[in-house]
């Protein structure tokens, strides 16, 4: 008699995970050196879903902007590090990389901050 194969059915379904990351661009937008709408368009054009640029997976990834905060929501695996990479790329493209840096201020968000230049070091150099 031939061996009988058992059919295994998986009853557990994966829950849809909703990843939500925010980028806080408040300081540069208020100072007028950066445009939040332009940055939102940059992210829309550059985010890759399934290896394709610009399609955002047919609504799987969404980008929303409220004043100077940009929120990226995703139903598929999406890396926070990838968002940082794209932000740095945008800053470099617009020659802002020398003044701004991307800092994680919580587990789900980044903030654009100015580099802190020490006044004390400059004063010491002037005295010499």
Swiss-Prot record:
This protein's GO CC annotations: cytoplasm; ribonucleoprotein complex; ribosome
Q: Which residues cross the membrane?
A: none
Which compartments does it reside in? Cytoplasm
Q: Sorted alphabetically, which InterPro entries does this protein's record hold?
A: Ribosomal_eL22 (IPR002671), Ribosomal_eL22_sf (IPR038526)
Key words, A-Z? Cytoplasm, Ribonucleoprotein, Ribosomal protein
Subunit info here reads: Component of the large ribosomal subunit.
- State the Gene Ontology BP annotations: cytoplasmic translation
The UniProt family comment states: Belongs to the eukaryotic ribosomal protein eL22 family.
> Gene for this protein?
rpl22
Name of the protein this chain belongs to? Large ribosomal subunit protein eL22
What terms describe the molecular function in GO for this protein? RNA binding; structural constituent of ribosome
Summarizing the function annotation, the protein's role is: Component of the large ribosomal subunit. The ribosome is a large ribonucleoprotein complex responsible for the synthesis of proteins in the cell.
